Structure formats: structure tokens, C-alpha cells
A protein has these predicted regions:
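Long alpha-helical, hydrophobic tracts
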Residues: 8-87, 91
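A glycine-rich, acidic short-motif signal
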Residues: 56-153
Length: 153
């Protein structure tokens, strides 16, 4: 039994959060992400997917770039009012960077930073959302650079 030229088959499949998370984690592990970093990246991808922001699609567009290129080293002495991602994915650098910036909030009520050469800032949103529950808010302003303001309320 075949399809006519104008017929389309639509299949709707749903997955649980756990299925998306574990499969994403396996993918990141296979891409060379270290233990812990693979969990952070899987959380980011799954959060975006669950919120309807196409986390899996975004991941599939980045796979070639991420394959065996994991490098999440951040030099804290180079983090001032601007941070250069050097076109590395926020999936790699984002978790450590956001944790560091949140630690700066302990010493100040407000911290402003511009992200330079960040080609995938959408991956920072789930990381910042986690801290919203702790009365730490953030704001993104997109222009040539990504400006972020992180504030402790």
C-alpha cells in the first residue's frame, strides 16, 4: 500500500524529560565532554526542548562543531566587563562561566558583562533560569555583542 503524491504522513511522538536528558547526556559523552560537563549540557538541551525552544534541533546543528573539541577552560583573570567566547559553544563554556559570575554576586549586588563572539547565547538561558529561583535575575540585550546583567534582588 503506497501513498499518493499529495499525501503526507504525520507522526506525533512524545518523549519524557528523562529520555531526552539521558540520550542527550550520552551524545555529549560521545562528543568528548567530560563527566559533569555532559550532565550540564544535557540539562541545557533538555530544558530548551521541554520549553519548546528546540533544544534537540539546536544540538543537531552544533554536533559537527562540538565533536571532540571540548575545552571549557576559563581564565578568571580575563573576566572583567567583557568576556570573549572565542566562538566556542556556550554548551562548553556556559556552565563554568555562569557559576563564576554567580559567585561574583556574593561580593556585589549587581554584575554587568558583555559576551563577545558568543554564537549560541540561547544555551545560557537554562543556566540563568536556575538562579532565578534564588532571587538572582538576569537580562540579555542583543546587539553586536550580548550584554548580560545579573542582579541579586
Amino acid at each position: 500500500m503506497g501513498f499518493c503524491y499529495y499525501e503526507f504522513l504525520l507522526i506525533f511522538v512524545s518523549y519524557s524529560y528523562y529520555e531526552v536528558y539521558t540520550n542527550s547526556q550520552r551524545a555529549f559523552s560521545g562528543l568528548g565532554f567530560t563527566h559533569g560537563a555532559d550532565e550540564d549540557a544535557a540539562y541545557i538541551t533538555t530544558w530548551l526542548e521541554v520549553c519548546g525552544l528546540d533544544g534537540i534541533k539546536l544540538l543537531s546543528l552544533k554536533i559537527a562543531e562540538l565533536d571532540n573539541t571540548f575545552n571549557a577552560i576559563i581564565d578568571p583573570s580575563k573576566i572583567r566587563s567583557e568576556f570573549d567566547f572565542h566562538n566556542q559553544s556556550a554548551l562548553m563554556i556556559g556552565p563554568g562561566l555562569i557559576d563564576y559570575l554567580i559567585s561574583k554576586i556574593d561580593n556585589h549586588n549587581e554584575f554587568k558583562i558583555s559576551f563577545k563572539n558568543c554564537n549560541d547565547p540561547v544555551f545560557l538561558i537554562p543556566l540563568l533560569y536556575k538562579y532565578a529561583k534564588k532571587n538572582i535575575s538576569s537580562q540579555f540585550i542583543s546587539s553586536q555583542k550580548i550584554n548580560a546583567q545579573i542582579t541579586h534582588n
